[in-house]
Amino acid sequence: MMRYARINSLDVTNGEDVGVSVFVQGCSFHCPGCFNKEAWDFNGGKEWTDEVESKFIKLLSRPYIKRLTILGGEPLAEQNLPLTHRLLQIATDIILTQKKQMKLWLYTGYTFEDIISYKSPNYSPTRAKAVILSDYIVDGKFEIDKQDLTYSVVKYAGSTNQRIIDVQKSIEEERTVLWEG
C-alpha cells in the first residue's frame, strides 16, 4: 500500500518556480532537527487512492504549474519507490501529452553517487531509475549543525552539505554536475 504525508498544491519553497509538492510517508534516516518528523513512520500518513491520484493529476495539469517535487519522508526508501515511480510516471505523461514545460525535483537523504553507482551498498536499479527520471535531485541527509535558514549557500536545501544535482547534465557529461539556478 502506497502512503503519503501531504500534498502542497501550490508550492514555491521546494524547488524553482511554482509547483506541486508531494511528501511521501516513511523515512529511516531520522535526521536530528528534521522539519518533517511526522513523515518518518512508514505506517503513518494517508493511503494513496485512485481519488487522491485523480486530484493529483488535476493539480499537476494546471497551466501555471512548472514543477513537481517529491520529498518526504524518503522518496527513495524501498517502501516508497512504488509511489515515487508512479508520481514520476504521471508527471512524465502530463509533460508528453500536454506538451507541458515542467521540471521534476526529488529530495533524498542518499547521495547521488550512492544512488547511481552499482558498487554502492545503497544501489538498487529501481532507486537509480527514479533519479534518472528526475531533472534535479537535492541529495544528502539534513545536518542540523550545517543548517542554512537563509539559503545563502544552497538554495532550496536545508543544510550546506546538501547539493542540487542537475541529473540530466550529469548523465550527459558522465560526472556530477551541480544545478546552476
Model-predicted segments: where are they?
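Charged helix-capping and loop-helix junction motifs
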Residues: T49-E53, P82-I90, K119-R127
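N-terminal [4Fe-4S]-dependent radical SAM core
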Residues: M1-F23, S28, N36-N43, T176-V177
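P-loop/Walker A phosphate-binding loop and immediately adjacent motor/lid segment at beta-alpha junctions
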Residues: L88-T92, Q147-G181
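Core AdoMet radical
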Residues: N36-E51, P63-E78, Q98-P121, V131-D145, ...
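Short cysteine-rich clusters marking metal-coordination/redox-active sites
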Residues: C31
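Short, flexible, glycine/charge-rich loop motifs used to bind or transfer phosphoryl groups or to couple energy/partner
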Residues: D11, K58-L59, P125-A128, V154
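Surface-exposed amphipathic alpha-helices with a cationic face
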Residues: T84-W105
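Short, charged beta->alpha transition segments
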Residues: E53-S61
